[in-house]
Amino acid sequence: MARSLCPGAWLRKPYYLQARFSYVRMKYLFFSWLVVFVGSWIIYVQYSTYTELCRGKDCKKIICDKYKTGVIDGPACNSLCVTETLYFGKCLSTKPNNQMYLGIWDNLPGVVKCQMEQALHLDFGTELEPRKEIVLFDKPTRGTTVQKFKEMVYSLFKAKLGDQGNLSELVNLILTVADGDKDGQVSLGEAKSAWALLQLNEFLLMVILQDKEHTPKLMGFCGDLYVMESVEYTSLYGISLPWVIELFIPSGFRRSMDQLFTPSWPRKAKIAIGLLEFVEDVFHGPYGNFLMCDTSAKNLGYNDKYDLKMVDMRKIVPETNLKELIKDRHCESDLDCVYGTDCRTSCDQSTMKCTSEVIQPNLAKACQLLKDYLLRGAPSEIREELEKQLYSCIALKVTANQMEMEHSLILNNLKTLLWKKISYTNDS
């Protein structure tokens, strides 16, 4: 009797194992399918974003169509549109309307920038309009004399910069830059290109600060496309990874990883000194004060000698221009009175209008950016003093009494502290 019970038990066991195996296999297949589906969806979304951000072919087509019909001209036009010796390389764009690429022009490395919309002066958190072909490169019109063009440029500078410095001298400098073929005359095509470029704060700043060490040099232009001096390292810190890998790295871990991939401390100190010197360059220069409205690591770079070079200056704007445009803006709170990420004014609750005074100066924003960058790995003998000076710097307010004196004192003290520590090191 006992023997007759065994076969049934023996038969039931494989069914149980088979059912369990099928369940495990189905679960495995389901999760495998889910991972593939989610991964494919993420890659598709990111690829779509990439193709939207990186529209170099569209930019080139628009510019070259205008050049070949004689509307615009400039030193980069022939290389871009005829000989094709100006190449677009790695895409660095962060917004579809501001195209940015590493490029090669006649075997020289550079950074190519192109606008994909009608250039507007300032944007307070709204999307810029799509590029309007009807009005692009519409000024100056045919028949405009050189003198009339100079008057147009002078009026534009007065609106942007106020009565700062010798504007007539700046106008003459612009005409020299606009004369791309250096024949002593500015053609209508060159004038149209120059006028379009002058609507861009970055181009204006490059011309004003063309002799300064930390401002990239202008290599050439065609329409509102322009080529800047190349920068070896296009971010203050971090490591460049393929975007597919970036998807799977948590933001907190990414920030920690960025801080690991930085130069040695003496080299970081030299780069930091460069940023402080750039702050000096834009603080009450010959044409007034310029405000840094997006002080982030991605906008700063450095060369192989660890000299700071600005990578993106599009959110550095003339103070006069910003004040004029923001002062009567309707607001509910201080959050409505922001340009870029860093330029903040306050909301006057009695009038529900933004005030014109920016709260935080450039130096305070630069020190905020440099705090973690410099304190990590700082030599123990200066760490306490460095931390103290950085926090004093961050606390600077535009409205403080004797702000300019404090600004100069803090800036000079910081530079002196850093220089003394790195003057005799090989790394610097």
UniProtKB/Swiss-Prot annotation:
Subcellular location, principal: endoplasmic reticulum
Keywords, alphabetical: Disulfide bond, Endoplasmic reticulum, Membrane, Signal-anchor, Transmembrane, Transmembrane helix
Lumenal-facing ranges: 49-428
Compartment annotation: Endoplasmic reticulum membrane
InterPro entries (UniProt xref): FAM69_kinase_dom (IPR022049), FAM69_N (IPR029244)
GO cellular component assignments: endoplasmic reticulum membrane
Post-translational note: Among the many cysteines in the lumenal domain, most are probably involved in disulfide bonds.
Cytoplasmic side: 1-27
PANTHER family in the cross-refs: DIVERGENT PROTEIN KINASE DOMAIN 1A (PTHR21093:SF4), DIVERGENT PROTEIN KINASE DOMAIN 1C-RELATED (PTHR21093)
Family classification: Belongs to the DIPK family.
Protein name: Divergent protein kinase domain 1A
Species of the source: Homo sapiens
Gene (name only): DIPK1A
